Amino acid sequence: MKNVNSKQNNHSTIGEQDIHFFHEGKHIYAYEFMGAHKASEDGIDGIRFTTWAPNAKSICVIGDFNHWQVEDKNHMKRITDAGLWSVFIADVKDGDKYKFVVTNKDTNHYVYKSDPYAFFSELRPNTASVISTQTTYKWHDEKWLKKRATADYYNSPMNTYELHLASWKTKDDRFMTYEEIAEVLPKYVKDMGYTHVEFMPLHEHPLDASWGYQPTGFYSINSRHGDLVGLKHLVDKLHTHDIGVILDWVPGHFCKDQHGLINFDGSACYEYQEPTKAINKGWGTHNFDLGRNEVKCFLISNAMYWINEFHIDGLRVDAVSNILYLNYDREDGQWVPNIHGGHENLEGIAFLRELNGVLKHTCKGVITIAEESSSWPNISTPVEQGGLGFDFKWNMGWMNDTLRYISLDPVYRKYHHNLITFSMVYHYSEKFILSISHDEVVHGKKSLINKMWGDLWNKYAGLRLYMSFMIGHPGKKLIFMGSEFGQFIEWREYEQLQWQVVDEYHTHRETLNFFKKLNEFYKAETALWECDYDHKGFQWIDANNSEQSILSFVRSNKDGKEKLIFVCNFTPVTYYDYHIGVPDAGSYIEAFNSDDLEFGGSGQLIADEIFSTPESSHGFDQRITIKVPPMATLVLKLKK
């Protein structure tokens, strides 16, 4: 895909090069001339409107500036046979609302459409696009961007806090503005020790309950929280607090509300022509035609828009399986095989490889993450090596297995020991992120703490055990908001988190303190992130003690000089005189203990040094004897 930068001082005309590469599917900055842009003609200032509608008979721009009347002078002119339309309209100003009246050439039926490339939209339930050209912002994150360009994410700490802006916090029973969020979120995330935030989708969507995953305005930011400048300020503040920003992005499908992309020119335009490929029954949406050049430009330019205009550091691509498979969530007879007779969506595969190739070439240091739940191979393998080119993949298998395990009565865990160990069999096949996301704490699945077995004490202990086991397991980390203080109710997108419980109950304060200390421990210990994807970074001590439901393993840094010994006890029993092999001779000290009293634990700590003895154990020449606290993770390290 050619790196075409069409930025001009005057958008009165659209360059031939822009037109050519747009229709060829090779333009990655289409947002610079598509949509509504400042222009002037014959010394008169106004706005040039441009859209793509190949099967339109006519398109008229209506809005505040002409009292929403269809007028001849505001009809677009078709400027290419392939369906580009454009018109200059004078005396249009920022903040004016507008729509396109699109008449189909075959049926003469007309529809009122929002601008697919609009930078701003009305707040739901209204659906008009809004002229937004005054978006200049003075950034202060040069230091961050310079560091990002040369970052080695695979060998750096990455501990992400996922959040839904509308329900993280509210103010006076209303949505907080981006500016208001910028005053509290960066400091909170920084103080808690996270390295990144991941925002659930920030593009415009009509239904709050869709959480942003059924968008209508891909270039329109979520108007519930304010304007473009406000969002830029929020990202800027996060960067100046040394926090990376990842955005959930939905390139596979779109909302079928009539003002949006569906049948944009009266026929299938952005979606596939074939209903078997276009209609996504499971989500009630339509799938993008990822083989159509202009649609590829729309989507890849959209990725570039978020990265360039808002300094986004990474895109987590939603529902990748829906892009890869023709038979995703479809029964036999509801899908048509590809030209080779298979179920692979060849156009979707090519799109993902092209997307990742473009971003890797043009956006140094920006990462892409695949939310993908199948066993499709080489998702995080570079494009030039035959892979899809993502930097990371969510480990849905680890999440499902371990959450199932941790919900079991400890009496029965020994029969399901493989659930807690199996992930290491395939861990090195991809660059995995261990994710406990929003999907796991909603729709009857229970909150994270409520997934834990037992009474109240054991639930808190189980949460501490599980999260410290997760920190020790190879792979980068992600946790959803509310889990860090042990919210018991499921996430509700229509109200803020129950922050009041932190003030009201010591158990929630202790849990919040635990997460803070655990995150700080993670960042401070190179053994926990330098070799996440290198075999030398992890070694089992004992993966087979199913009878006592105890795991032990070693994490090592790049040069092997820093090692951490993890002992995870998934039962409420304290084990005394427990023997484990260790890789080095010397004295060991406690580095972290999830059973600490300050976290609400029972206080079964190891206060003294533990000296190894030259006895063979678990394949090592040295052995230590320890007390293993109940329902807890104990971490030891060699004393310097």
UniProtKB/Swiss-Prot annotation:
Pathway: Glycan biosynthesis; glycogen biosynthesis. One of its GO terms (biological process) is glycogen biosynthetic process. The active site is at 318 (nucleophile), 371 (proton donor). Its EC number is 2.4.1.18. GO terms for cellular component: cytosol. It catalyses: Transfers a segment of a (1->4)-alpha-D-glucan chain to a primary hydroxy group in a similar glucan chain. The keyword Glycosyltransferase applies. It comes from the Bacteria. The keyword Cytoplasm does not apply. Keywords: Carbohydrate metabolism, Glycogen biosynthesis, Glycogen metabolism, Glycosyltransferase, Transferase. GO terms for molecular function: 1,4-alpha-glucan branching enzyme activity; cation binding; hydrolase activity, hydrolyzing O-glycosyl compounds. InterPro entries: A-amylase/branching_C (IPR006048), Branching_enzy (IPR037439), GlgB (IPR006407), GlgB_N_E_set_prok (IPR044143), Glyco_hydro_13_cat_dom (IPR006047), Glyco_hydro_13_N (IPR004193), Glyco_hydro_b (IPR013780), Glycoside_hydrolase_SF (IPR017853). Catalyzes the formation of the alpha-1,6-glucosidic linkages in glycogen by scission of a 1,4-alpha-linked oligosaccharide from growing alpha-1,4-glucan chains and the subsequent attachment of the oligosaccharide to the alpha-1,6 position. Monomer. Belongs to the glycosyl hydrolase 13 family. GlgB subfamily. This is 1,4-alpha-glucan branching enzyme GlgB.
